[in-house]
């Protein structure tokens, strides 16, 4: 362990009960080099399956959810470190690292199909993205097993964002619009054109629960989305009731704790 890693490790131990201090977005002089080193050593994935709502079997893919290992059993979730990365201007670097590590995982398992997030602000091609796309271009069978999920945190740039998506598709990757129905996802859907996958935000389930008008609106949205996307997924399915409501709304694929528990039990 070098000096930088040792210092950051010591800081992590000191702030064990308040990990937010390590990636504090309000810090006056954040040590971005040390933070990058730490993330490179601690990045791990929780893989959440996208399953058929009717339980007929099959997994569309597994989303690689970023975690930072902290000790033997504890992990940091994105809410604890992403704001700090954004404030330090490291979001694109982090997304590129996540995609690269996901590609490594696909190479290690020839049967796996994985997805990972790319924030809309990161979806602008640069030298590092070019290197990643070149890597995928020479392994088209691997690229076909990768889903890039465009998140809704910011609007996707109409020019550079569309060029990024086009370049990714040229390699064979599939494109998903994440959290559709929230934030800037509708705009990002327009920029992407016809996405391979649209993932409905978990708020859609709340609309279904609330009243008949909400149920009608979600069914209509699902029907329209099916016309412009290969697959529609609803996120945040946590209970059997959520699964049944998803089926009633016409959604064939779902993701959430309800399916993760079933997958773990299997």
Feature locations, PLM:
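N-terminal sensory regulatory modules of PAS/LOV and PAS-like folds
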Residues: 78-81, 98, 259
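Structural preference for long, well-ordered alpha-helical segments in enzyme cores
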Residues: 85, 98-102, 132, 221, ...
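Charged helix-capping and loop-helix junction motifs
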Residues: 130-134, 162-163, 212-219
């Amino acid at each position: 362990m070098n000096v930088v890693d040792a210092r950051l490790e010591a800081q992590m131990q000191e702030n064990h009960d308040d990990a937010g201090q390590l990636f504090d977005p309000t810090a006056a002089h954040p040590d971005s080099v040390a933070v990058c080193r730490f993330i490179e050593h601690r990045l791990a994935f929780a893989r959440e399956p996208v399953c058929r709502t009717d339980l007929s079997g099959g997994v569309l893919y597994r989303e690689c959810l970023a975690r930072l290992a902290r000790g033997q059993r504890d992990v940091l979730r994105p809410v604890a470190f992403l704001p700090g990365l954004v404030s330090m201007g490291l979001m694109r670097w982090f997304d590129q690292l996540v995609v690269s590590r996901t590609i490594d995982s696909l190479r290690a398992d020839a049967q796996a199909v994985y997805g990972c997030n790319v924030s809309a602000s990161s979806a602008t091609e640069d030298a590092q993205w070019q290197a990643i796309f070149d890597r995928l271009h020479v392994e088209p069978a691997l690229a076909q097993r990768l889903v890039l999920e465009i998140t809704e945190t910011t609007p996707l740039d109409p020019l550079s964002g569309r060029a990024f998506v086009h370049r990714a598709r040229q390699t064979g990757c599939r494109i998903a619009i994440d959290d559709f129905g929230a934030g800037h996802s509708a705009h990002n859907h327009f920029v992407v054109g016809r996405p391979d996958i649209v993932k409905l935000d978990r708020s859609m389930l709340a609309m279904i629960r609330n009243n008949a008008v909400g149920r009608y609106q979600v069914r209509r949205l699902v029907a329209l989305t099916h016309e412009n996307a290969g697959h529609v997924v609803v996120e945040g399915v946590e209970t059997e009731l959520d699964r049944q409501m998803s089926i009633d709304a016409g959604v064939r694929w779902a993701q959430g704790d309800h399916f993760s528990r079933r997958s773990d039990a299997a």
